[in-house]
Amino acid sequence: MQTGTVKWFNSEKGFGFIEVEGGDDVFVHFSAIEGEGFKTLDEGQSVEFEIVEGQRGPQAEKVTKL
């Protein structure tokens, strides 16, 4: 698992990016956020996640808020 900080997240479109210290930003889709109900992330929020290879490059999976 990796940790990072939410760079930005658009709740209307359902995606954003997570900033990883010493690495490239990672794409995150709302479907990768763990938990029930409305899934969104706040800018500056700390998260833990796994990186998988998506169709357009690395993306976050199993995202949990810290």
From Swiss-Prot:
<dbReference type="Pfam" id="PF00313">
    <property type="entry name" value="CSD"/>
</dbReference>
<dbReference type="InterPro" id="IPR012156">
    <property type="entry name" value="Cold_shock_CspA"/>
</dbReference>
<feature type="domain" description="CSD">
    <location>
        <begin position="4"/>
        <end position="63"/>
    </location>
</feature>
<dbReference type="InterPro" id="IPR012340">
    <property type="entry name" value="NA-bd_OB-fold"/>
</dbReference>
<dbReference type="GO" id="GO:0043488">
    <property type="term" value="P:regulation of mRNA stability"/>
</dbReference>
<keyword id="KW-0805">Transcription regulation</keyword>
<dbReference type="GO" id="GO:0003676">
    <property type="term" value="F:nucleic acid binding"/>
</dbReference>
<keyword id="KW-0238">DNA-binding</keyword>
<dbReference type="InterPro" id="IPR011129">
    <property type="entry name" value="CSD"/>
</dbReference>
<dbReference type="GO" id="GO:0010468">
    <property type="term" value="P:regulation of gene expression"/>
</dbReference>
<dbReference type="GO" id="GO:0003677">
    <property type="term" value="F:DNA binding"/>
</dbReference>
<keyword id="KW-0804">Transcription</keyword>
<dbReference type="InterPro" id="IPR019844">
    <property type="entry name" value="CSD_CS"/>
</dbReference>
<dbReference type="InterPro" id="IPR050181">
    <property type="entry name" value="Cold_shock_domain"/>
</dbReference>
<comment type="subunit">
    <text>Homodimer.</text>
</comment>
<keyword id="KW-0963">Cytoplasm</keyword>
<dbReference type="GO" id="GO:0005737">
    <property type="term" value="C:cytoplasm"/>
</dbReference>
<keyword id="KW-0010">Activator</keyword>
<dbReference type="InterPro" id="IPR002059">
    <property type="entry name" value="CSP_DNA-bd"/>
</dbReference>
<protein>
    <recommendedName>
        <fullName>Cold shock-like protein CspLB</fullName>
    </recommendedName>
</protein>
